[in-house]
Amino acid sequence: DISDLMIPQGSVVGVVGNNGAGKTTFANNLCGLLKTAKGCMSMNGKTYMANQRIKTCYMVMQDVNHQLFTESVMDEILLSLDNSDEEKAAHEAESIMESLHISEFRDAHPMSLSGGQKQRVAIASAIASDKQVIVFDEPTSGLDYRHMKKVAENLRELSSLGKTLFIVTHDPELIAECCNYFVFIENGKVLWSDGWNRISRERLQRFFAFEGD
């Protein structure tokens, strides 16, 4: 139940709140994945209704196993590209794999990779889709600190491409590493939204201190 929400384009938005607050529902609604999705999203002078948002939004699920479909990493990325020019698509896929350091796995079956490697394949597919809004649902769930840092680096690189990212997360370290705007959800409503400043920092510190008790 969100009447109005403005997000600076190109932001890395941390979507924060307690379990059951409505964060994942918000993410699915944003992407137009819910049959009950309502409202509209405006970006670059265009307005997108619920059934149109799926064309401009891409979701990387918490369990990326649910969105890996092909027999090789290369094919997985090609699936998201325009293949009308096969040579150009292959070149783009190679470039994306190189940027995410997964070129060595180009011929590997995605399901044979580690959790972190699978996630990078999912991120590669998100880049290949060329969609302007990318939503991540708990991208560091189950990852250690080293791999969390790598995910944060990947997210910052994505942001540098001009994408607007929404990160549904309970990970304060990930937030500190890469988020620059925040949406706090409670009981299905946006309680507050803001960039980094003294007030938002104090709010986040109180929330995560309470959550850890």
Question: What do these predicted ranges mean?
Answer:
Residues 31:
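Helix-to-loop junction immediately C-terminal to a conserved catalytic motif
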Residues 169-170:
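H-loop/switch region of ABC-family ATPase nucleotide-binding domains
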Residues 16-18:
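The feature captures the beta-strand-to-loop junction immediately N-terminal to the Walker
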Residues 109-113, 117:
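Conserved ABC ATPase signature
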Residues 88-105:
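Conserved ABC ATPase "signature" region
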Residues 134-137:
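Catalytic Walker B motif of ABC-type/P-loop ATPase nucleotide-binding domains
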